[in-house]
Amino acid sequence: MAQSSLVAAAGRSGRVIGDYAVGRQIGSGSFSVVWEGRHLVHGTVVAIKEIAMARLNKKLQESLMSEIIILRKINHPNIIRFIDMIEAPGKINLVLEYCKGGDLSMYIHKHGSVPEATAKHFMLQLAAGLQVLRDNNIIHRDLKPQNLLLSTDDNDAALKIADFGFARSLQPRGLAETLCGSPLYMAPEIMQLQKYDAKADLWSVGAILFQLVTGRTPFTGNSQIQLLQNIIRSTELHFPADCRDLSTDCKDLCQKLLRRNPVERLTFEEFFHHPFLSDKQSYDFTRSRLDSRTMNDFHSSGSSPSRNIEEISQEDGLPFFLDDDSSGPEGSPSSFKHTSPMKSSYGFSVERREAALSPLKNMDLSSRYSRVSHRAETNNFKFEGHRLSDRSQFKPSSLPDSRSFSTQGRGDSPDSMDQDYVLISGPPVDIPSSSSGSPKPFNYPFKSHSPPVEFIKRNVTNLTAPMPIASATGNNLSRFGSLESQNCIPGTSHGSLDLVDAFEQPSTNSLTRIRSLQKCAAAIAELVHERGENGKHLEAFSIQLVILAIWNQALHICHTQAVSGIEGSLLQDINRVGRNISHGGSEKLLPQIQKEFVQEVERAEELAKFVESDNAKMPDAMEMILQAALALGISGGVDEVMGDAENAGNLYSKAVRLLVFLAVEAQTLILNPPLTLTNSVRYRLRTYIDSLITRLKHLQSHRRTSYPQKQ
């Protein structure tokens, strides 16, 4: 009867996909709709995942194919069964087995904590599925209750691992560096952006077991940063008071799986043979260990009950929007959004080509960005060979001639293991042992079909480590002084120059550093606007990439300080010098920086639309910034001679800001290759800055003399 009604419904709607009549919609995600289907001849109920390929960028398409390959390769009772793939114009339909029991998160939401015997039943099946993945050198990387499906809604249900969009093949002893998965079940080494191996899945298993027997996740937090802080600060795993009846073996397994240090965590073999899983009566783990085979084609005869996707997660098995959990039951503990880092250079990739008409090493757009092909893949615009020319030098009579900046070249970054979210090593930096680590490059996987704001909201919080930032009890003021403390003349809006110490290193005060980066970005943004107004869109785009790198550095600092827990945290900094950034505490600092970053991302995407060809030569942003600074200094001198002191002060201040950026901050940004200044260039920059500040002080002194303050 049910079969005839479904076929009749399909006939009325005209929806038939391959050999399957399409029934009601049972779920939807960011890129797909899931339908209940039934085989027209055999009556087998299936889940049909209809994916609109036009909505997937290249990397998501690769992730989809990766999922298909994994499911096609493995045939195991604890792995979701792949039945068929049916292609249609602009769409791919995945036919999967149908699980009428829903997922484990729905089960936990309905039942709360479960008896230990039930938890063991599910864990034995999860272990069996993981054994198959391990035998095939696969890390799932997104194990969570939402991705564990149940054949029925009872305590004897078969558990099946699903959603392999994040999974990847990992060679034995290999380490990955991508950020994937859901925060509440994510291993701390992943959240801290450290290399990780298959043991990351075991942390997730421990979190799932803990939630099964207690009804709650082992660690919580109002944000991913707070969650990580709680994990780091925890010295032991605490069980709720109402869980005193848990067996010693159960508690022991949870504790050993949830060890913060992966070296101390159980190995897979120790996990498989742990006493808690030693009872084979409820599940024959040995027989189930490895029942996988390679299928010769996409069609697999037979079916078994599978996924009830009443409420499918928004990422829908595709690794872009992470852990939105819009599908989860109301009140589900997985309620906040996952964040992700980004990769390589400072957002884009540009390969160096020899320029015919300029001593600069002009760059080409080697990776197709946004509008050029709308492939929206993970793009890298790399500045190769930052070299500033001798042209248009600012040469006051008292200053030495300017020479070109020198750079230290660097080869291309190694191929990433995962192109969606991967970290690759940044330029080598000498840092003290107390540092949080050297910087790592990042990428912006922009999407042509999704607003950048939505991407950043989900993926911008957890970033790579910044240049070393240590707490400071006082401001480490620049040898150039602070214009703010010198009654800077009106209009010098770029404010304080307390940016560097005697060794021209960035301030060790975290908030002072962020303020410096903010002002540098504002000054450089004027150059972008000016070139955009003059139709020099490629130049504007090149400079805009530097702004993205600046805001990425600010996000680095904010994130590192938030998770460090050291004395002199951002909250203390804000209370001490919290001007221009945030007045509401450290919890408001990161969102404000994120907002700025999002706006700059959108500007970059708009400018990228004007990149007409992959062979367009990318101008050197650092050279343009230097020349702009020198031109501002010259214009300021002209205005001073002409008696326009206020405008001269404005121009001098902007020039100083740009020069200080080149002398200090630019060397700390994630550029490929990194900008390296010789000692002679540093000296010349210092001389320029000193000369300009001398003129500013002269103007200030003249203004005080001309307009004495009333007593």
Curated annotation (Swiss-Prot):
Biased composition (Basic and acidic residues): 383-393
Region (Disordered): 318-342, 383-419
E.C. number: 2.7.11.-
The keyword Acyltransferase appears for this protein: no
Motif AIM (Atg8-family-interacting motif) location, chain numbering: 421-424
Role this protein plays: Serine/threonine protein kinase involved in autophagy. The ATG1-ATG13 protein kinase complex regulates downstream events required for autophagosome enclosure and/or vacuolar delivery.
This protein's name: Serine/threonine-protein kinase ATG1b
Lineage: Eukaryota, Viridiplantae, Streptophyta, Embryophyta, Tracheophyta
